[in-house]
Swiss-Prot record:
Its EC number is 1.7.1.13. GO terms for biological process: queuosine biosynthetic process; tRNA modification. Keywords: Cytoplasm, NADP, Oxidoreductase, Queuosine biosynthesis. This is NADPH-dependent 7-cyano-7-deazaguanine reductase. It catalyses: 7-aminomethyl-7-carbaguanine + 2 NADP(+) = 7-cyano-7-deazaguanine + 2 NADPH + 3 H(+). Gene3D superfamilies: 3.30.1130.10. Pathway: tRNA modification; tRNA-queuosine biosynthesis. It is an enzyme of class 1 (oxidoreductase). The active site is at 52 (thioimide intermediate), 59 (proton donor). The gene is queF. GO terms for molecular function: preQ1 synthase activity. Substrate binds at residues 74-76, 93-94. Belongs to the GTP cyclohydrolase I family. QueF type 1 subfamily. GO terms for cellular component: cytoplasm.
């Protein structure tokens, strides 16, 4: 069999159970065939869930992850499973958002990465969390995240 950039992936193309926790989730990556070009990749997770570490109640967020890849691309199914592993994980909004960004940045070594966590209200107040690796790169089209502020029923 011919070796490809997809060789070695374990989760893509088959049934895979949701990891028990973010620490047990296995991210996978593939070589970027366009590594000589600076471009933006966006992942949106509009139904992200985790648990409040104090009450065990579910928390919900709309996550937007932008990154300008270097040598590596995250394999999207592994990212989906990693994000899904937070479903039974207790952590505050800030910790969830920043830890996702830091893990992806450490794993992929992108030219740049940012994450916006737009958390739905708990206690009547939405919490939005933003993290990025450094200044936005020049010459790359990086659209606004365009997640409107929470308005409730108004």
């Amino acid at each position: 069999m011919t070796e490809t950039i997809y060789s070695g992936l374990k989760q893509l193309g088959g049934a895979t159970l949701l990891p028990e926790s973010p620490d047990k989730a296995e991210l996978e990556r593939v070589r970027n065939p366009q590594a000589d070009v600076a471009y933006n990749v966006r992942f949106t997770a509009p139904e992200f869930t985790s648990l409040c570490p104090m009450t065990g109640q579910p928390d919900f967020a709309h996550l937007v992850i932008d990154y300008v890849p270097g040598e590596w691309l995250v394999e999207s199914k592994s990212l989906k499973l990693y994000l899904g592993s937070f479903r039974n994980h207790g952590a505050f909004h800030e910790d969830c958002t920043v830890s996702i960004g830091r893990r992806l940045a450490g794993f992929l070594a992108p030219r740049w990465l940012r994450i916006g966590g737009y958390w739905y209200p708990r206690g009547g107040m939405p919490i939005d969390v933003f993290w990025q690796t450094g200044p936005m790169p020049e010459g790359v089209w990086i659209p606004d995240q365009d997640v409107p502020p929470y308005r409730g029923r108004g």
